[in-house]
Structure formats: C-alpha cells, structure tokens
C-alpha cells in the first residue's frame, strides 16, 4: 500500500511512502494528510470470512491491507499484544472484555458500541494502544527515538500518555487547554509522573493547541532535528485502527452480509467518523454516517449548508462534552479530499483559505450535492439535550452514558430509519464526567477499580502561553537534557 498527501505531495518515483514511513511522520511535507493511494475493496466473500473472526483476527485481516510493509508475523504479534481482555478490562459487569468492543442492544434495532473499556475509559484507547506498540516496534527495529507532540481537548492526551509511558525511545509532549478539561480528565494526565511524559497546559482553547502542533510539524528543520512525531488523529495509523471496530460492530448487529446499518458518531476532530467513512468506501454496508456535534457545530453547519467556517478562539464554547469543544476539525481534510474526487489542487486551494483563518463554501456545487452519496447526515446537541438524553437512557435502559455519547444518541435518534439497525458509538465511560452525570441523574457514576480517588493524586504540569516558539523552546530544552 502506497500513500499520498491530500495536498498532492508524492515521494519520488521508486520511493513511495509506505505505512511505516507515515507512521512516524504526522503531517506530510506539504502540510497535507496521508491517505492510501486507493482504498482496498472487499468482496462479499471477504465479508463472509470476516464475520467469523474475533477482534484480533479481524484487526490483522484489515490492518495488513494498510500496513503491508510490516511482516505479517510481526503485525500479528503487535495486534495480539494490544487487544487483550486485560488491557480492555474496564467492561461493565454484563459485557465480555474478550470482545474488546462489545455491542449492547438497548432495544430492537438500537445498539450501543462499547469502545471505552481501555485503560483511560475512552474510545481513543482502541487505536492508541496499538499506536504505542507500533511506534516501539518500528523505533526499536530502526534504532531510532521519537518525540511525540500532541494536542488534546480531553481524552487523546491521557490515552496517548498511557499508551506511551515507559516505551523505549519515546518522549511525549502533550498540549491541553488550561482549565478546560474535566477534573477526571485533568487528573488522568497530570498525575502521571513518568519521566518521558510532559504535560503543557496552554492558556487558550484546544484549537490553539492543535494549531501549535501543526505549526511545529510544518517546521521541517525543527521536526527533523528533534524527531517530532504525532499521535493526534491526523496520524493515519490511528484512523486505520479505528476502521476495525466498524466492521466488528456491523457483524455483531446483523445476521447476514449485505444488510445495511447506520452509525451515529459524536464528532469533534472528525477522526472517529472518518474511519467509518473509509469502512464504507471499502465496501462495508453502511447506509448512514450520522455526525453529532455539540454547541461547537462547525461540522454540522458544513453538512447542512456546505459552508466550512472554523471559529476563532473566542467563539469556541466550553461545554459539558469538552472533548468535542473543537472548531477546526483536523481530519475533515481527508473526507473533503474524497468528496472533491481526490483533486489535491482543490484541497490545497480550500485549505489555503482555512489556514489563513478563512472559510470555504461548497454549496451549489456538485461536490456538496454528492455528500448524500457518501451517506452523511448531521445534527447538533446542547447541554439541555445531553441532560435529557442521559436521563432517558438511564430510565429506559438502566444504563449510564457519558455526555459525548449522549450527543451521539440524541442526534442518532433524530435520523433513525425504520428497519435499519442504528449503532451509536460510546466514546467514554460516564465516570469521566461525574459533574454532569450528577446534574442529570442526581447521583454519581460508579468508577472502575483503580480510579476511585484519582483527583487526589499529586499532579505535574507546566502552564505555557499559546506560542509556537515557547513550545519549541520547551521541547529543545528537554530533548537536550
């Protein structure tokens, strides 16, 4: 499998980018995102064979299509080490951790995909644990080291840090918006004392953090000198790892290949639902991809109107689903690349405007008309909606859900179709957002063992201005130390 950039960069003939090249690189040299030259297409016989596979077997079958420069035995060993019941052991009492991503039926035709049973209780563990093991495998094989620079609005940071702590040859520099995460999320990250983990609390919002990561990644001299890599959802390996659970959920929710299902996905940075889009392009029978936003509704606005208008820092709202408090979706470029027929020059034109603080408008174009062909619909959820949905699910199904999952269920139900199974993606366990759960239900969610008093642990972080040079200086000092 060869990889190209959404903005047109292709390596010289005879040295095309492969999976292990882009694994460590983050952004492509032209500032675009890595994409497969072509999506593998699966035949009916492939789906029939996959239906009988467990999670590890399914992951190997799918990821070997994208990572074919890793020997199959090595890839299998990495996958087998990643997807175990021990690592994903925070399942509810009636879920089997051997399933890795258990599917729960709430009522006939309505399902919840449990993605948050990993070490940090968030869906991002599914891909991040694999990413940590892949990084260590490639770095050890090549005798290299890597300095990971990431940005988080809540869950990516802790997921990345737990996946990378203690890994040979890896340091993590994680940017988060100061005071914008839940107390639980903050404690998960800042309580880590590992010497290879550095938490930088940026005086700004998540988009400031993300912009700094992109700016550093686009400084090719600095990136090369300090071996900068990324774990954010711009990393193709994360997206490809997330494709697996769409297939697993499909097989669990259907009896026969060819049946169509719809997925509802809480969306901030577009990485999770981007994996669903790619699964659909590969031939998985997905009827609708239902994108749910919170009050930061940049993506909902695009899918309704064709206008993509990232908000300024001052316009980004702080909400009770903080991991979606994002106004510039970094993975969205991948979908637009497909939407415009993989015309890299058009993507460059559109993102030149975005990168300068502007917007673009595809309304009235054949591209916008083609969104329906990709199965996308969208909707928006507010704090009041979240509270009502949390209450509804608890009263009807005796199940506590977190705030982001509530956004997904609320919008998913608005687009539910008779006769089409609806699978809502659970993105975190409610223990991470006890304040809002208490507001909705008048009681606190139970915490898995080991998380009972996490907020009381000593915390370590460094407050920093939203300044690219300040972050570069911090990295340089600690890499040289």
For each of these PLM feature ranges, what is it?
Residues 1-481:
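PLP-dependent amino-acid enzyme catalytic core
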């Amino acid at each position: 499998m060869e990889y190209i950039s959404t903005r047109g960069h292709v390596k010289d003939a005879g040295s095309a980018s492969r999976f292990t090249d882009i694994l460590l690189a983050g952004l492509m040299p032209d500032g675009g995102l890595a994409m497969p030259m072509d999506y593998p297409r699966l035949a009916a016989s492939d789906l029939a064979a996959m239906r009988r596979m467990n999670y590890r077997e399914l992951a190997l079958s799918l990821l070997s299509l994208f990572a074919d420069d890793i020997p199959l035995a090595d890839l299998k060993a990495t996958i087998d080490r990643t997807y175990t019941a021990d690592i994903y052991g925070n399942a509810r009492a009636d879920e089997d951790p051997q399933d890795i991503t258990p599917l729960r039926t709430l009522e006939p035709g309505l399902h919840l995909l449990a993605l948050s049973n990993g070490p940090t209780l968030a869906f991002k563990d599914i891909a991040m644990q694999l990413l940590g093991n892949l990084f260590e495998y490639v770095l050890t094989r090549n005798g290299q080291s890597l300095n990971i620079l990431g940005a988080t609005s809540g869950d990516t940071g802790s997921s990345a840090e737990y996946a990378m702590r203690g890994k040979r040859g890896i340091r993590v520099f994680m940017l988060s918006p100061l005071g914008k995460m839940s107390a639980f999320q903050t404690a998960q990250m800042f309580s880590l004392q590992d010497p290879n983990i550095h938490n930088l609390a940026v005086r700004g919002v998540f988009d400031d953090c993300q912009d700094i990561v992109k700016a550093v990644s686009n400084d090719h001299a600095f990136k090369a000198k300090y071996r900068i890599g990324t774990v954010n959802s711009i990393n193709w390996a994360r997206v490809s790892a997330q494709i697996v659970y769409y297939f697993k959920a499909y097989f669990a929710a259907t009896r026969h290949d060819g049946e169509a299902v719809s997925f509802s996905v809480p969306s901030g940075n577009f990485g999770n639902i981007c994996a669903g889009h790619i699964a659909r392009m590969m031939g998985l029978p997905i009827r609708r991809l239902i994108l749910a936003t919170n009050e930061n509704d940049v993506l909902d606005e695009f899918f309704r109107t064709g206008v993509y208008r990232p908000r300024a820092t001052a316009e980004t709202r702080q909400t009770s689903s903080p991991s979606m408090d994002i106004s510039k979706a970094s993975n969205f470029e991948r979908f637009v690349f497909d939407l415009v027929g993989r015309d890299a020059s058009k993507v460059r034109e559109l993102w030149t405007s975005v990168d300068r603080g502007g917007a673009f408008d595809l309304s009235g174009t054949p591209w916008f008309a083609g969104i329906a062909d990709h199965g996308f619909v969208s909707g928006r959820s507010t704090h009041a909606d979240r509270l009502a949905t949390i209450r509804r699910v608890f009263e009807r199904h005796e199940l506590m859900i977190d705030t982001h999952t509530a956004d997904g269920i609320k919008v998913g139900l608005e687009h539910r179709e008779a006769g089409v199974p609806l699978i809502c993606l659970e993105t975190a366990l409610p223990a991470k957002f006890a304040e809002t759960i208490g507001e909705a239900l008048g009681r606190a969610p139970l915490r898995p063992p080991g998380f009972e008093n996490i907020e009381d642990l000593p915390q370590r972080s460094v407050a920093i201005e939203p300044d690219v040079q300040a972050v570069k200086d911090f990295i340089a000092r600690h890499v040289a130390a």
